[in-house]
């Protein structure tokens, strides 16, 4: 098929928009693959849709290989099912809520567990109806507080979400492993790097969860890799607790004047210059800082949060939470939010300090009224610290945990660093972006929504569920980010919007294009009346892997072939070049080319 640029909905831009946060995102906007229409909201243009559909069709192909059945649900839902499952409250401000003219509650679905469960409840009545795996590719909606990086974190995004339904846990594990194998094939075919990490189920619920993360410094997910090759999302990583220490002979804690000290570096410098520690250098890790957060109470399902720490906070009505962490650490907010779900927390701002005179900035420590204290696992009984004394310009030296100060609970929410010790040895900390997530949901939604079938003995039995998601629009953005240089995009052949990009420089040789009509390839022909420089610049920006130059420098059937991947240029007869492209396409693992169900078309 031949598409002429003069007949195409197409425009490129020479400069990145001011809001561009990454090179690949900038090229997607400049080349006209997508257009931003609002904060975290994008329109898909013809070039972008062609690539997106190829990603979707690869996913569809691999889903068919594991007998998954495609359906399509609406994005708009009544809140009834979400209230029944408990997620109407669990999601808090992260979902778009709205009311109809009768004041009924609705939402734009962030995921579709409830809808799939209800559908299967109405269709499946017997064990003979199981197992089943059903999926859709649909837009989702989340009210991101700070949308960023284009399609990587947007308010509207495309996902493939699949759900398995089995009679028992063994069947659930088999369905889970089948999806996991399919995901590996999908990401391998898309040529995207990934690491499989153990993860937290979060608001999705369930017991077993794994993420597919694409390693990149752009990522907002932290994961750790252990010496034996195991990988964990930071949210589920377990810090080794410090050893209990006998403090029966430890000296008494002392108050120390620390005028002007408001940070850990200030405190370390002051201590090392005070002359109190002869022969010893004080490090940040010798100090215990208290990071103060304001607690925001969310509606808790049935008054029971299912989280003992949160239950304590609710029962005693605390307004603030103080995290006691070593001075060389910070609070990992994602770990903290997971540990305290369904509560949300916000760092204490100036207003908090203005309303609470006892909160002394720079010298906050244990013992404040109205604060629920959570200590890092390293704060073991008998460990000695330099802490804030809750008085201006005063800290305490040699404060012993369990003797001089106490806390309400131990909570593992500190930041993790490369070299930290784990039960598997030292860890390496990396960053990544989630591209896929697998959950063994178990009976959470089946029990909540009454999904049961009759077993062989005629008894009603709750159905075991699994949930499996892939971020389609996020994959699109990441693949663009990975496959670009300073001049533009460089799509893998399996995903490129066209097989060939013809730069027509000589109208006298335009008849060569006729030989491309029936070759079975998708061809973009730049027939615009613009300068060769503009055409070449746009060809590099768009990123089709093979650029064919038809001009006066070649004769007869010869054309110049420009390989966008390595920038090599060769002169070949047009038919030979076409045959080479077709052969490479036909040996790429696809056995259904030109049958109408090709996973890349």
Swiss-Prot record:
GO terms for molecular function: aminoacyl-tRNA deacylase activity; ATP binding; proline-tRNA ligase activity. It is found in: Cytoplasm. Its EC number is 6.1.1.15. GO terms for biological process: prolyl-tRNA aminoacylation. Keywords: Aminoacyl-tRNA synthetase, ATP-binding, Cytoplasm, Ligase, Nucleotide-binding, Protein biosynthesis. CDD domains: ProRS_core_prok. PROSITE patterns: AA_TRNA_LIGASE_II. Its main location: cytoplasm. The keyword Ligase applies. One of its GO terms (cellular component) is cytosol. NCBIfam families: PRK09194.1 (NF006625), proS_fam_II (TIGR00409). Belongs to the class-II aminoacyl-tRNA synthetase family. ProS type 1 subfamily. Catalyzes the attachment of proline to tRNA(Pro) in a two-step reaction: proline is first activated by ATP to form Pro-AMP and then transferred to the acceptor end of tRNA(Pro). As ProRS can inadvertently accommodate and process non-cognate amino acids such as alanine and cysteine, to avoid such errors it has two additional distinct editing activities against alanine. One activity is designated as 'pretransfer' editing and involves the tRNA(Pro)-independent hydrolysis of activated Ala-AMP. This is Proline--tRNA ligase. The lineage of its organism: Bacteria, Bacillati, Actinomycetota, Actinomycetes, Micrococcales.
């Amino acid at each position: 098929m031949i598409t002429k640029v003069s007949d195409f909905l197409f425009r490129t831009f020479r400069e990145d928009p001011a809001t561009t946060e990454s090179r690949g995102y900038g090229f997607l906007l400049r080349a006209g693959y997508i257009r931003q229409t609002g904060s975290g909201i994008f329109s898909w243009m013809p070039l972008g849709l062609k690539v997106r559909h190829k990603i979707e069709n690869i996913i569809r192909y691999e889903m068919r290989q594991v007998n998954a059945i495609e359906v399509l649900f609406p994005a708009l839902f009544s809140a009834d099912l979400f209230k029944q499952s408990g997620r109407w409250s669990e999601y808090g401000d992260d979902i778009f809520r709205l009311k109809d003219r009768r004041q009924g509650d609705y939402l734009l679905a962030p995921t579709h567990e409830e809808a799939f469960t209800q559908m299967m409840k109405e269709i499946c009545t017997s064990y003979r109806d199981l197992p089943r795996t059903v999926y859709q590719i649909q837009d989702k909606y989340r009210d991101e507080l700070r949308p960023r990086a284009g399609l990587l974190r947007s308010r509207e995004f495309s996902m493939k979400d699949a759900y398995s339904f089995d009679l028992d846990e063994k069947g659930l594990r088999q369905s889970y492993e089948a999806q996991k194998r399919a995901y590996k094939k999908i990401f391998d075919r898309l040529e995207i790097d990934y690491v499989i990490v153990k993860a937290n189920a979060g608001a999705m619920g369930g017991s077993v969860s794994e993420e597919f993360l694409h390693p990149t410094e752009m990522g907002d997910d932290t994961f750790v890799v252990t010496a034996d090759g195991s990988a964990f999302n930071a949210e589920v990583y377990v810090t080794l607790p410090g050893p209990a220490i006998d403090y029966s002979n430890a000296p008494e804690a002392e108050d120390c004047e620390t005028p002007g000290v408001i940070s850990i570096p200030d405190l370390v410098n002051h201590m090392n210059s005070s002359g109190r520690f002869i022969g010893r250098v004080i490090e940040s890790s010798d100090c215990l800082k208290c990071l103060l957060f304001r607690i925001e109470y969310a509606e808790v399902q049935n008054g029971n949060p299912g989280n003992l720490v949160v239950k304590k906070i609710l029962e005693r009505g605390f307004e603030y939470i103080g995290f006691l962490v070593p001075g060389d650490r910070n609070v990992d907010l994602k770990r903290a939010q997971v540990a305290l779900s369904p509560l949300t927390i916000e760092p204490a701002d100036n207003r908090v300090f203005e309303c609470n005179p006892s909160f002394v900035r720079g010298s906050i420590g244990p013992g404040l009224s109205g604060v629920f204290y959570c200590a890092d696992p390293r704060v073991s009984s008998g460990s000695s610290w330099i802490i804030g004394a809750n008085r201006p310009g005063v800290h305490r030296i040699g404060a012993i945990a369990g003797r001089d100060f106490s806390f309400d609970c131990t909570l593992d929410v500190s930041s993790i660093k490369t070299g930290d010790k784990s039960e598997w040895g030292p860890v390496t900390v990396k960053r990544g972006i989630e591209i896929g997530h697998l959950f063994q949901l178990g009976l959470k939604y089946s029990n909540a929504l009454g999904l049961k079938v009759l077993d062989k003995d005629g008894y009603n039995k709750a159905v075991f569920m699994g949930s499996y998601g892939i971020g389609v629009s996020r994959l699109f953005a990441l693949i663009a980010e990975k496959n670009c240089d300073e001049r533009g995009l460089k799509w893998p052949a399996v995903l490129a919007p066209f097989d060939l990009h013809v730069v027509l420089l000589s109208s006298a040789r335009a008849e060569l294009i006729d030989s491309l009509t029936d070759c079975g390839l998708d061809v973009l022909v730049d027939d615009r009346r613009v300068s060769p420089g503009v055409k070449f610049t746009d060809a590099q920006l768009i990123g089709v892997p093979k650029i064919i130059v038809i001009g006066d420098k070649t004769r007869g059937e010869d054309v110049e072939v420009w390989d966008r991947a390595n920038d090599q240029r060769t002169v070949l007869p047009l038919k030979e070049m076409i045959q080479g492209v077709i052969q490479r396409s036909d040996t790429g693992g696809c056995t259904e080319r030109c049958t109408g169900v090709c996973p890349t078309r």
